[in-house]
Curated annotation (Swiss-Prot):
<feature type="binding site">
    <location>
        <position position="514"/>
    </location>
    <ligand>
        <name>Zn(2+)</name>
    </ligand>
</feature>
<keyword id="KW-0325">Glycoprotein</keyword>
<dbReference type="InterPro" id="IPR034030">
    <property type="entry name" value="ZnMc_salivary_gland_MPs"/>
</dbReference>
<keyword id="KW-1015">Disulfide bond</keyword>
<protein>
    <recommendedName>
        <fullName>A disintegrin and metalloproteinase with thrombospondin motifs like</fullName>
        <ecNumber>3.4.24.-</ecNumber>
    </recommendedName>
</protein>
<keyword id="KW-0862">Zinc</keyword>
<dbReference type="GO" id="GO:0002168">
    <property type="term" value="P:instar larval development"/>
</dbReference>
<feature type="glycosylation site" description="N-linked (GlcNAc...) asparagine">
    <location>
        <position position="124"/>
    </location>
</feature>
<feature type="region of interest" description="Disordered">
    <location>
        <begin position="67"/>
        <end position="91"/>
    </location>
</feature>
<dbReference type="InterPro" id="IPR041645">
    <property type="entry name" value="ADAMTS_CR_2"/>
</dbReference>
<dbReference type="GO" id="GO:0004222">
    <property type="term" value="F:metalloendopeptidase activity"/>
</dbReference>
<dbReference type="GO" id="GO:0005576">
    <property type="term" value="C:extracellular region"/>
</dbReference>
<feature type="domain" description="Peptidase M12B">
    <location>
        <begin position="353"/>
        <end position="585"/>
    </location>
</feature>
<keyword id="KW-0964">Secreted</keyword>
<feature type="disulfide bond">
    <location>
        <begin position="485"/>
        <end position="580"/>
    </location>
</feature>
<comment type="function">
    <text>Involved in larval molting and metamorphosis. May degrade extracellular matrix (ECM) and basement membrane (BM) during the development of organs to allow degeneration and remodeling of tissues.</text>
</comment>
<dbReference type="InterPro" id="IPR024079">
    <property type="entry name" value="MetalloPept_cat_dom_sf"/>
</dbReference>
Amino acid sequence: MESSVATHWLSAFVILCSFITTQSLNNKIHEHMTIDELRNVFHVEHHSRVPEYHLVQLTHHLARRNIPTSHPANSNSADSGKTPHLKTEKVTKGGYKAPSLLNDEMFVEAKKRIEDVDIMGDPNSTVSVDFKVQSSEFGDSESLSDKEHSAESQEDGVHKIDLEAFGRQLKLVLKKQEGLIKKDGLKVWKALKNETQPHGVDYEEMITEDDEEFGDLYQDEENGAALLIRRHPKHGKLVVEGSIGHDLVIRPIPDTMTSPAQDDEMFMDPSSMADMVSIDTGLPIMKRKKEEQDRLQEALNGAQHVIIKRDPAEVDHMSDYAFMEPDHIGKRYRRKRSAEAHNRQKREAPYVIYPEILVIVDYDGYRLHGGDNVQIKRYFVSFWNGVDLRYKLLKGPRIRISIAGIIISRGRDATPYLERNRVGRDAIDSAAALTDMGKYLFRERRLPVYDIAVAITKLDMCRRQYANDACNRGTAGFAYVGGACVVNKRLEKVNSVAIIEDTGGFSGIIVAAHEVGHLLGAVHDGSPPPSYLGGPGAEKCRWEDGFIMSDLRHTEKGFRWSPCSVQSFHHFLNGDTATCLYNSPHEDDSLPRVLPGRLLTLDAQCRKDRGTSACFKDERVCAQLFCFDAGSGYCVAYRPAAEGSPCGDGQYCINGQCITEHENIIPDYSQHTPSYVRPETSPFYANITSSRH
């Protein structure tokens, strides 16, 4: 009897010790990650820099009585003998809740009443997941309570998630998004140093994974959630990544941690690894201990994601902007408005405008994401989904972000405009880099058509008040006010450019929205407009109110646009210099049988549109026809030249390309940057305005 009791208590003690050990492991799961895993999940390269996070496991259910009879989930029922896609799961943070502590009878009863279905397979389904938080000595512990999930949504692609994390209750209503990526898919290029190519850089289009593997984009406007959701190709579970609100990020846990240990699984990081082993190359590598991998599996308990809380210091950054020319030039050109231009009927902005963004990822950003092209694509699509979400809050004008393409830099020399302006090891002079970027893009004609080019860097951005001053850090973004679609011909510089800093974890989303706002004509709240744009400015809106065009984004207003910003957008988008934003990136213009460009010269087309002449008569007109506007002094891109328009010696515009007559059309994406021209502008450094602190 005594022996039996002793055995019982000994067993209980062993179980308790095992539970506590697993709890501790769960609370510090990041300490068992390799450097590559840290970089993949948290975008940091040292365990001490990992932010606060929760381990999360997602579950999706539909009530059986509400499942449409035509839904394929019916074939996954218990009667069919097929295994459903997903299983009932729970959420943990800090502490681990052993399966033995669950109410088995409640689990069995719930399993009888509900049925797992494929959230991606049913666009009409409504999904609800409830996360509840309770305290433990290891931190907050979250458990999942199953709720009734129905297919009551009447709108395709709407899914609901109820969750409580970091003391906040969130009810996400996620709607599937279209339009950020073009119908023919997202184009991605890699940029490499090559002295034989123009500007010493070679651009090569990359073949990436199909859209099904890539996933679908979802947004919740009210809660500021922008997510990319896909199915894992092996086990079929949902993989979710993106941003929630201004400080939460959800990321998947690497497969190397969620998969059982394999004999051929090798790691270079020495933390929690076995002794070094040798392979044929003679180089030492490290292998994670099987016992360690098993403990990770037990601690994760099937969790596939982490919710990360960003440091507020990473959210609130200063922003700078530059004016495009001195004030007196803008006034003079407004006085020169000709009677012909004044009487010409103005083209009003459409109900929806589509800024097409060319995303340029520098080499440090490439390394930040582990050099994984697929992950880089997913991250930055999720990133711009978050930026687009901020513009979705505008009810008028309606602005829909579209990605023209992504360029991934495979070396520092692939972005020479950044490299030439390095300050020390980890910073760049933002004003000088922006100027050089504009000049580089003016000469570069191998890139896809775009309205705005944005370089994204992990490097710290700094500013000099004067040429030889110290470069003061703290800036996170830099752009020209009203620069969208604009080129300075005298200085040979594109003004439709911006540089933003992003250190991972979607820290640069609001900064990107802010800088694109500058390019679309908005100034900082509390500031007057530049004279060359005119309009309402933002003097009536206080900087301290903390809207997007302020740097004091400490409340929910940091997701919204001030009334002054909205008025500035209206003014800019209805001006003569914004017409390149009017075309939809998804228009499918079929080739007409009679080519109108053979009937009207480029000058004749401009006379009909602007009453003036064409600014350029080379291959650029196939992407955008620039016509001189006497009223503003700019060359304005109204639309592409008509099909069949001449674009060089014996060459004509066909499907947006300048080709020799009867030549086969082979896509090479060599169209020139959409741009405007304004003569007699002054050098950039004479017109820099800093943000308010």
